[in-house]
From Swiss-Prot:
GO CC, alphabetical: plasma membrane
Any Pfam family the entry gives: DUF2614
UniProt family annotation: Belongs to the UPF0295 family.
Organism listed in the record: Bacillus cereus (strain AH187)
UniProt xrefs under InterPro entries: UPF0295
Predominant subcellular localization, coarse grouping: membrane
Protein name: UPF0295 protein BCAH187_A0594
Cross-referenced HAMAP family: UPF0295
């Protein structure tokens, strides 16, 4: 069974989307505590803060996405954005690298860490 690679930008966007749904779920839980206004307000505020946090994450990844390197994937011939030394295609999840020293090596996200020496 092969390893499923995923693009870093898509991972962060998925995290932000999950924050939206988690925030709405937490705020909805506050409805069940209508008789205790403090608990209800706390749940709704925590849910609201999770939705605001997702907005911040979406803004951050949008700004980061404008600074990334755009390349053409050799497998699907579609443009994709690459963060770091190794990443995966946004469309076909093909492992990609722009570092000549890593060509032909097994895909590993540890190559993106500053402490890793090739």
């Amino acid at each position: 069974m092969s390893i499923k690679y995923s693009n870093k930008i898509n991972k962060i966007r998925t995290f932000a989307l999950s924050l939206v749904f988690i925030g709405l779920f937490i705020a909805y839980l506050g409805v069940f505590f209508r008789e205790n206004i403090i608990i209800m307000t706390t749940f709704m505020m925590v849910g609201f803060l999770a939705v605001i946090a997702s907005t911040v994450v979406y803004f951050w990844i949008g700004m980061l996405s404008t600074k990334t390197v755009q390349i053409i994937c050799p497998s699907c011939d579609k443009p994709t954005k690459m963060l770091g030394r190794v990443d995966a295609c946004m469309h076909c999840n093909q492992p990609l690298t722009m570092d000549r020293n890593l060509e032909g090596k097994e895909f590993d996200e540890k190559y993106n860490k500053k402490s890793y020496k090739s």
